[in-house]
């Protein structure tokens, strides 16, 4: 992950991170390491693709879900932000604190359409 963090090109950085994420035996702090490696990426598309790969049934710790929601809330594109937040809403455990955090992240979405998509998903 350290090598990927120092790369300048978003495409190659996302490819390296994606390859590393295929190895499910990565240490338990893979969320922090991956998000640190993603810092500085300008492409909302590549950020969202990596975040969606991090969202899997192996995410057990509420703090890991919280980190995913925090990062997703800072994606600039309303479309990609809503895509990631909807995937998180589908997979995350039923926790009031996580739902509240997800709704706060959704409020950063400027588009009424995409905001509504996320709110509908969290209301299920």
Language-model features, listed with the residues they occupy:
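Non-catalytic all-alpha helical scaffold/repeat segments
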Residues: 1-124
């Amino acid at each position: 992950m350290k090598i990927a963090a120092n790369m300048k090109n978003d495409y190659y950085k996302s490819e390296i991170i994606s390859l590393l994420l295929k190895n499910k035996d990565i240490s338990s702090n893979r969320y922090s390491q991956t998000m640190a490696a993603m810092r500085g990426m300008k492409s909302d598309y590549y950020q969202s693709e990596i975040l969606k790969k991090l969202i899997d049934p192996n995410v057990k710790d509420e703090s890991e879900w919280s980190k995913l929601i925090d990062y997703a809330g800072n994606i600039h594109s309303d479309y990609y932000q809503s895509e990631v937040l909807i995937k998180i809403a589908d997979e995350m455990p039923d926790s009031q604190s996580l739902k509240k955090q997800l709704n706060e992240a959704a409020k950063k979405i400027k588009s009424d359409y995409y905001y509504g998509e996320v709110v509908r998903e969290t209301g299920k």
